Amino acid sequence: MRACHVCPLKKPAGCCKEQTMNIVDQQTFRDAMSCMGAAVNIITTDGPAGRAGFTASAVCSVTDTPPTLLVCLNRGASVWPVFNENRTLCVNTLSAGQESLSNLFGGKTPMEHRFAAARWQTGVTGCPQLEEALVSFDCRISQVVSVGTHDILFCAIEAIHRHATPYGLVWFDRSYHALMRPAC
């Protein structure tokens, strides 16, 4: 007998009226998600498992007390074992004009070529910080939650480095768009 996924009493499947689900196929979900603009980030790590980085838009704040953000990482990604072992990362939010760097870190380019394409500093956690990023969040991974194909990495922020560039970069409708800070 299958247990009801909604009912905390573990009654048989179909017992709860709230169980009605709207099944959304993968393509419909992806098309809908393309309507949500998001900052473009390069996530980096360095530690016992080595140096790695990837492009991500699935990044957001969780709380400011303590300062925490989350990063979603596919467990099937080639970089997953490196991040999983190192347990530190830096979220480097890209500026307008860094689209080619985003594409480089989003592809199958070898790691040494990815990192050779930009200038980096070392953050307090030892992770690479992109010198020309809009902002960099240097973090320790405090918790990992698995959902479907991805791990949600909860990241305790240890340091923040802001840069002077006035232009941000977002991913919207499957393409890059530059944003400019309003004049004060």
From Swiss-Prot:
Listed InterPro entries: Flavin_Rdtase-like_dom, NADH-dep_flavin_reductase, RutF, Split_barrel_FMN-bd
Domain of life: Bacteria
Induction pattern: Up-regulated by the nitrogen regulatory protein C (NtrC also called GlnG) and repressed by RutR.
Pfam family for this entry, one: Flavin_Reduct
Catalytic activity: FMNH2 + NAD(+) = FMN + NADH + 2 H(+)
Enzyme Commission number(s) from the entry: 1.5.1.42
GO molecular function, one term: FMN reductase [NAD(P)H] activity
Family to which the UniProt record says this protein belongs: Belongs to the non-flavoprotein flavin reductase family. RutF subfamily.
Job of this protein: Catalyzes the reduction of FMN to FMNH2 which is used to reduce pyrimidine by RutA via the Rut pathway.
Protein name as catalogued: FMN reductase (NADH) RutF
Organism: Escherichia coli O6:H1 (strain CFT073 / ATCC 700928 / UPEC)
Gene name of the encoded protein: rutF
